[in-house]
Regions:
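Short beta-strand edge/turn micro-motifs at domain boundaries
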Residues: 107-133, 149
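Sequence context surrounding c-type heme c attachment/ligation sites in exported
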Residues: 154
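Glycine/tyrosine- and acidic-biased, solvent-exposed loop/turn segments at the edges of beta-strands
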Residues: 3-8, 25, 29-30, 131-132
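Cysteine-centered loop/knuckle micro-motif
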Residues: 20-22, 148-151
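Long C-terminal interaction/binding lobes of large macromolecular proteins
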Residues: 55, 59, 90-92, 103, ...
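Core segments of small alpha/beta cavity-forming domains
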Residues: 24-65
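Short Cys/His-rich zinc-binding micro-motifs
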Residues: 3-16, 135-144
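Surface-exposed, charged secondary-structure patches
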Residues: 70-105
């Protein structure tokens, strides 16, 4: 992704340009809500920005390092629900990916906490599954086109 090109859409699926969406958070501005932090973290996974992921992970649950070299090719994000109550937040999402010739998804119910005016990812309950899109199904890459005229050809 060419982050210097202001017309590039943000990987989080907001339909905004990256420069107006997740980039300010990646550059250190605090996320405004749990959903905003989750979207920015998804974008960081797409961009393999381990530094940002670690910085936005709560100290109580943060791993000492994060290796993203073998990460799948993340293709789209679907936010199912998001809520905020005081200093706690929850986001339920599904992230789709391509791994080799197949497709899969990661679904998570994430918990967030606000400390010192910043939201942090705390933990999540995850499940994964395989996708077998039909030719006339929506493409899991998030393009909005049918699978047969999009990624099936690749």
């Amino acid at each position: 992704m060419d982050a210097t090109n202001s017309s590039v859409l943000c990987p989080c699926g907001s339909a905004l340009g990256y420069a107006r969406c997740c980039q300010p958070w990646h550059l250190g501005q605090p996320a405004s809500a749990p959903e905003a932090l989750m979207r920015s973290r998804y974008s960081a996974f797409v961009m393999k920005n381990a530094e940002y992921l670690l910085a936005t992970w709560h100290a109580d649950t943060r791993p000492s390092k994060l290796d993203l070299e073998d990460s799948p090719e993340w293709t789209s994000l679907q936010v199912i629900s998001a809520s905020e109550e005081g200093l706690a937040g929850k986001v339920h999402f599904r992230a789709f990916y391509r791994a080799g010739e197949g497709w899969g998804y990661l679904e998570e119910h994430s918990d967030f906490i606000k400390e010192g005016g910043r939201w942090y990812y705390l933990s999540g309950d995850t499940s994964e599954g395989q996708l077998k899109p039909g030719r006339n199904d929506a493409c899991p890459c998030g393009s909005g086109r049918k699978y047969k005229v999009c990624c099936l050809r690749k």
